[in-house]
Amino acid sequence: MRVAIIDYGSGNLRSATKAFERAAREAGIDATIDLTDKPDHVASADRIVLPGVGAYADCSAGLNAMPGMHEALIEAVEKKAHPFLGICVGMQLMSSRGLEKTVSTGLGWIEGDVVEMTPSDPTLKIPQIGWNTLEIRHAHPLFDGIKTGADGLHAYFVHSYHLAAKHSTDVIATTNYGGAMTAFVGRDNMAGAQFHPEKSQTLGLALISNFLRWKP
C-alpha cells in the first residue's frame, strides 16, 4: 500500500509523515508513506492525505498553483474512490467555500462554508489551541475502538474557523468550545479531521491506523 501525503508547502509535513509511519509500523500494516508534490504519485496512490495549516485562502491558492494536482485529486478520490483524509485546513478545503480573509473555493466534497468560530463564552480565546474531547454524532470506521465523549481520549486542536456543514449527516464528530464546533467530517471514501491526528498521541495514532485499514 502506498499513502500519498501531498506536499504543497503547507502542513506539519514531517510530523505527519512520521506519525503515519509509526502507526503503520505499530499496527503491522505494510505501507509506504510517500510525501510528494507529484500529481502522478497522488493519482496512483492507494490512499491520499491532504494536510494544511494557516489561512484557507493561502492553502487553496497553494494547492491550485500546483499544475495537475487538482486533476490528480479528482482522479484518485472521486473517480477511483480511494480513501482520503484531510487534516486541519486540508479538511476545511473539502468544503464548498472558505470565508477567511476572502471568499475562496474549496474542493466541494462536503457542502458548507468554513466560517469563524463564535463561542458562546466570551472568555474563550480564538484560536482554540490545545486538547479537547470529541462527541461522536454518527458512527464512522475511523473511530472504531477509540474512546470518545467527556471521559474519552483528547485530540489536539489549533484553529479559528470550522466547517459549517450543510448536511448534519456529514458531521461525524464535534468538539465543545463554547458550543459544538465541527471536529470531523466524512462522506463515502472521504474523511477530514479539524484536529491534528499527528499531534494527538493515542487518539491520533489509532485514527491513522483505522484510516490505513479503512475499506469504504
Swiss-Prot record:
Query: Pathway, according to UniProt?
Result: Amino-acid biosynthesis; L-histidine biosynthesis; L-histidine from 5-phospho-alpha-D-ribose 1-diphosphate: step 5/9
Domain (Glutamine amidotransferase type-1) spans 2-216
Q: GO molecular function: any one? A: lyase activity
Q: Identify the EC number(s).
A: 4.3.2.10, 3.5.1.2
User: What are the top taxonomic ranks of the organism?
Assistant: Bacteria, Pseudomonadati, Pseudomonadota, Alphaproteobacteria, Hyphomicrobiales
Name of the gene: hisH
Q: What is its main location?
A: cytoplasm
Please report the name of this protein according to its UniProt entry: Imidazole glycerol phosphate synthase subunit HisH
Q: What does this protein do?
A: IGPS catalyzes the conversion of PRFAR and glutamine to IGP, AICAR and glutamate. The HisH subunit catalyzes the hydrolysis of glutamine to glutamate and ammonia as part of the synthesis of IGP and AICAR. The resulting ammonia molecule is channeled to the active site of HisF.
Look up the domain of life of the source: Bacteria
Instruction: List GO BP terms, alphabetically.
Output: L-histidine biosynthetic process
Give the originating organism: Agrobacterium fabrum (strain C58 / ATCC 33970)
Q: Where is the active site?
A: C88, H196, E198
Q: Which Pfam families does this UniProt record tie to the protein?
A: GATase (PF00117)
Outline the subunit composition: Heterodimer of HisH and HisF.
Q: Where in the cell is it found?
A: Cytoplasm
Q: Which GO terms describe its cellular component?
A: cytoplasm
Q: Which InterPro entries does this UniProt record tie to the protein? A: Class_I_gatase-like (IPR029062), GATASE (IPR017926), Imidazole-glycPsynth_HisH (IPR010139)
